[in-house]
């Protein structure tokens, strides 16, 4: 139950620490996050704040969305996300969320959507071994047995098989804030994170 912020993934680079060790980092652009709704147990059944991000002209939004934003006194945004908080009364409608929420060395949690790979087989999706490639074998990339015959007479749910790979919600926990550039609104986090460039990442302060 902690506040956070949304940002656009710019890409990866590296920085050097005091010992000269190269550390891989992901750069995230934080820009234009505002509180568009405050939810409480009395009105919505749970405590949370809704954060609008991704600026967009009001004239380009639907009429219901324009009304929702005008009620909160915020400008045009195209995307929304929520953070569950303990005391929603600590926040105000239209309040801007900036990099002041974070400090260097702080641990954060990052959530994003992984790159979609489409339909993939067992070798690519689950790292299965191949079958024999020579000596007359035709079982190169086949899945093999997926269950017994009349008992149980079905394929168990969750069986690892070919299917859609990627485009899934992925959360990376306990990553470190290494650098903050407030003039450019850029946050540098240690390591790599799901998605490609321009993907939206949700960065949450550790409880």
What are these regions (language model features)?
Residues 1-207:
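Extended basic (Lys/Arg/His-rich) segments that typically form rRNA-contacting surfaces
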């Amino acid at each position: 139950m902690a506040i956070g912020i949304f940002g656009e993934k710019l890409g990866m680079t590296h920085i050097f620490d005091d010992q000269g060790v190269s550390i891989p980092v992901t750069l995230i652009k934080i820009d234009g996050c505002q509180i568009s709704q405050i939810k409480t147990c009395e009105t919505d059944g749970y405590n949370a704040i809704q954060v609008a991000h991704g600026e967009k002209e009001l004239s380009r939004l639907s009429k219901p969305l324009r009304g929702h934003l005008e009620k909160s006194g915020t400008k045009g945004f195209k995307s929304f996300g929520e953070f569950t908080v303990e005391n929603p009364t600590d926040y105000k409608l239209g309040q801007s969320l900036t990099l002041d929420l974070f400090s260097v060395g702080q641990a954060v949690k990052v959530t994003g959507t992984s790159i979609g790979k489409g339909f993939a087989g067992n070798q690519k999706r689950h790292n299965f071994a191949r079958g024999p490639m020579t000596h007359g074998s035709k079982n190169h990339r086949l899945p093999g047995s997926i269950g017994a015959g009349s008992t149980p007479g079905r394929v168990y749910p969750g069986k690892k098989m070919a299917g859609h790979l990627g485009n899934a919600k992925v959360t990376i926990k306990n990553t470190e804030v290494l650098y903050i550039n407030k003039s450019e609104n850029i946050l540098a986090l240690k390591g790599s994170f799901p998605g490609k460039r321009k993907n939206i990442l949700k960065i949450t302060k550790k409880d």
